[in-house]
Design a protein with these regions (language model features):
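Detector for small/aliphatic-rich hydrophobic stretches
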Residues: 1-79, 226-233
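Phosphate-binding/switch region of NTP-binding enzymes
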Residues: 159-226, 233
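Hydrophobic/aromatic beta-strand patches that form the interior of the parallel beta-sheet core
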Residues: 52, 78, 101-103, 153, ...
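Long, charge-dense
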Residues: 78-134, 138-141
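A contiguous pocket-lining binding segment that forms or flanks enzyme active sites
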Residues: 120-175
Length: 233
């Protein structure tokens, strides 16, 4: 496999597709998520063949928490050019290191080709492109994602970097609207738990906005669901 920070060639990724691509049964329409996230979703997990957008302060932490259940269950994950993705933090959140590959962001001219190869290979592909994704690349990747039953996750962190709008709306959009830390006393102690408010909307039966509050412990692992609004009943 590729070491953290090593650039993978498209040909190598294509070879991985032949070796590791799992069989997807027709009944397996979703990838599992922690129970706390279910009120946000129209189905019992992340719909296969979809593109998911996660934005706002805490977007990377929520992405890790979203992927952890599927990763522990055997799904393979590729992280492509996501500077906010911490290797140790992802492992603490529950993402399985042995089924995760980190890839440097490819050159713009090769970006679509490399991402397509990863979609062919992995169940989950996490991206944070620094360039404007072309309409043709967006359409091809959407079609490939649907065909292969993968899930592409576009992370958009409030870190000052310029973000470009995708030509095609995401099937599911998660937004972190508030974030609060606890654990500090009167000038001493350490930051422990983090409370996040996450809303979701989109297509494929997710047109009605839903909202939950969750707590992540100091390691970044999902600790509890605090409340939900507009979720499934």
């Amino acid at each position: 496999m590729f070491e953290h920070g090593e650039m993978a060639e498209a040909s190598q990724l294509a070879a991985l597709a032949q070796r590791f691509r799992p069989a997807v049964l027709a009944a397996e329409q979703t990838l599992p998520v922690a129970e706390a996230f279910l009120p946000l979703l129209p189905l019992d997990g992340l719909p296969r063949g979809s593109r998911v957008s996660v934005s706002g302060a805490g977007a990377t932490s929520i992405t890790m928490a979203l992927l952890a259940e599927a990763s522990r269950g055997g799904s393979w994950t590729a992280i492509v050019g996501v500077p906010s993705w911490g290797w140790a933090a992802s492992v603490r959140s529950g993402v399985a290191a042995q089924r995760t590959v980190v890839v440097d962001e490819p050159p713009v001219s090769q970006w679509g080709q490399v991402i397509a190869a990863l979609v062919d290979t992995f169940d989950l592909v996490v991206v944070d492109p620094t360039h404007q994704v072309t309409a043709s690349d967006a359409r091809r990747l959407a079609a490939r994602t649907r065909e292969r039953g993968s899930v592409m996750v576009d992370v958009r962190v409030d870190d000052g970097r310029r973000r470009f709008r995708w030509p095609i709306d995401a099937d599911l959009s998660f937004s972190v609207s508030t974030s609060a830390w606890s654990g500090l006393g009167d000038g001493f102690g350490r930051l422990d738990d983090r409370e996040l408010t996450v809303s979701a909307s989109g297509r494929r039966g997710a047109d009605r906005q839903r909202r939950i509050q969750v707590r992540l412990d100091g390691s970044g692992r999902l600790a509890a669901a605090l409340a939900n609004s507009g979720g499934r009943t």
